Amino acid sequence: GDVYKRQDGGIALSDGTRVLPDPFLVGRDPKKLQRLGEQYGIERWSTDLDAALKNKDDEVYFDAATTELRAENVQRAIAAGKHIYCEKPVASSLEEALKLYALAEQAGINHGVVQDMRFLPGLLKLGMLRDSGFFGRSLSIRIEFGYWVFEGDQQPAQRPSWNYRKEDGGGIIIDMLCHWRYVLDNLFGRVKSVSCLGTRHI
């Protein structure tokens, strides 16, 4: 998101001021980082997270790494005194997530997680219809979601394997149900219980 905000001239605040993000890309593949930097005009990139976290001028750490790497990376950023903005899921387990929350609170930093799907055009329209009384009283809500992932034999797979392979730290349930939780909370009410079935069709 920061990349596109930079191209648009920064983030507009309510008083008309514009804030221009100065991102520092950190990843595992230097060739990809260099290509992204050149493509979007970002000069700062590194494969060394700890070195990047030492820069006092960078106050906010945004984590969009794979789920299995996230908890450790966020913990290192908290220890470096950075404010945290994090993709979901925050961690692979409730225990890890609660530990990160406790560490962030103890450090006295601001911390939050992505809730981007709340602002998808279709869901905003759904909320508008709900508020207008279009549906009447909702007694039951059902959401179905799936990834269409090309197998790679006839055409290249279009999603990285960690998005959907449990053994790579992903899986549609851990990757997506946390997003649908806040969608349901904000559109229809608090979730009281969950029943879930995940399958893979080839």
Regions found by a protein language model. Name each.
Residues 24-30:
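N-terminal Rossmann-fold cofactor-binding loop
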Residues 3-4:
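Short, small-residue-biased leader/transition segments that mark boundaries at the very start
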Residues 99-116, 136-140:
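Rossmann-fold dehydrogenase core element
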Residues 117-202:
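Predominantly a Rossmann-like dinucleotide-binding segment in NAD(P)-dependent oxidoreductases
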Residues 31, 39-103:
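Beta-loop-alpha module in the N-terminal Rossmann-like domain of NAD(P)-dependent dehydrogenases
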Residues 20-24, 59-61, 170-171:
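Short active-site oxyanion
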